[in-house]
Amino acid sequence: DSGGDEAQREQMAQAQYLDLAGKLSAARKEAAQKLGGKVSAAMQSLAMAGGRFEIALTGFEGNAHGLEEIEFLVSAHASLSPKPLAKVASGGELSRISLAIQVITSKVSLVPTLIFDEVDVGIGGGVAEIVGQLLKQLGTERQVLCVTHLPQVAAQGNHHWQVSKSSQGGGVVSSIQVLEPAARIEEVARMLGGVEVTAT
């Protein structure tokens, strides 16, 4: 009878789903531990000493994406327990954690262009240089666009644009200008000193 055949097909499909979903769950658990450890290690050099990154896998009935929900958790300091990333990380921390994840997963990621806005908020000196080097490393395999105010980050770029704002007719107008090699050097030097660059 067709009703019995249909029930049997449904049972077979359910068994196949559970088998594949179980394999996916095992792979996710292993990948979550590895990625969590690597991102936590990267956070130490990105001005988040003592910070931890974890991936929580919470089981539920299942859907087309598997048998668990996935949530990124972070703690900015060793004394804090990890909380949902979106609720506890500042904009700059989010950007740096995203940068760490992108660098770590770059070999398997298919994203052709990455955009980082204010990845350097709240950092300077050596940490800024590390961020710049990580961005440059990412840029060897894909296009990376980064808005930055730090010369240590800007100096790592292959191409530079300068964004400026001016008052016009009672409003503010933003403009963007491509910087040629000499202008790039001058702009990075200006960022270092904060003043107009002169010949002396």
Show which residues each predicted segment covers.
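GG-anchored amphipathic helix commonly corresponding to the ABC/SMC/Rad50 NBD signature/C-loop
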Residues: 72, 76-79, 92-114
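Conserved D-loop-proximal element of ABC-family nucleotide-binding domains
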Residues: 108-109, 121-129
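Extended, charged alpha-helical coiled-coil/arm scaffolds that mediate oligomerization and mechanical coupling
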Residues: 1-46, 50
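Short pre-catalytic strand/loop immediately N-terminal to key active-site residues, enriched for Gly-Thr
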Residues: 82-89
